[in-house]
Each structure stands twice: as structure tokens, then as C-alpha cells.
Amino acid sequence: MINNNKLKITARQQIKRNAGGMTMSKIQMTTPLVEMDGDEMTRILWKMIKDELLLPFIDLKTEYYDLGLEHRNETNDQVTFDSAEATKKYGVAVKCATITPNAARMDEYDLKEMWKSPNGTIRAILDLSLIHI
């Protein structure tokens, strides 16, 4: 069992003998992971990581937040605040890279306004000085 007061995972590695070989049950999560999806290629990479490396071995429980620029625009950036509050609640999160808009991105994405950096917003809410991605 892994327990760092924030993430609690109970590993059930019960090996069962089947007719065709051995199988292991998945690691069970007791605390959900706050999943902050990002923009562009990071969406694809995160999905590959989940599908290939995590889901086959872990009964992955997540609370999903789409921090892609289009969705932040649709929600007036409320999704960024909600994801940070969920991180405070559960104590563990994965955040993918996001776009901080500039003038060119404002036109490209037809943004309502030039939204602040999600990293800066999340750092302020969580009282952090640095986010490692």
C-alpha cells in the first residue's frame, strides 16, 4: 500500500491461475486523480500514457477537467479555477501543457479575452511557487 497522506493506492496483487496462464488484478485507487487535460499534442500523449501504461494496471479513478484553450474560453476560464479547487480537495493532480494566449492566439481561437496562464492561476490558488510538468 502506498500512502503519502494525499494519494492512497491499495495494491491487490492476487495472482490467479487461469487455464491460459496467470493474471494480476489491477491496483485499486481510493483517491481520485485530478486530470487536467491540455492543448494540442499533450492531449494525444496523455491519452496514450493512460491507455498504454496506466489503465492496463490501475483501476484509474479521475476527476476530469478540460483545460484546453477552447474549453477555457467556453467556461470563461472557470474550469481552471474548478480544477485547482479539486486539486486542493484530493491533493493529487496531473496537468498537461496548456496554451497561454497571445494576440495571435486570440484571433486564431476567437477568444473572448486574453485568458491568464492556467499555471499561474493554479499556482495562486494552491499557494505554490512552481509547477513541474
Task: For the regions a language model picked out, list residue spans one by one.
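Short, Lys/Arg-enriched N-terminal segments with co-localized hydrophobic residues
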Residues: 4-23
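Conserved small/polar residues in nucleotide/adenosyl-binding loops
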Residues: 131-133
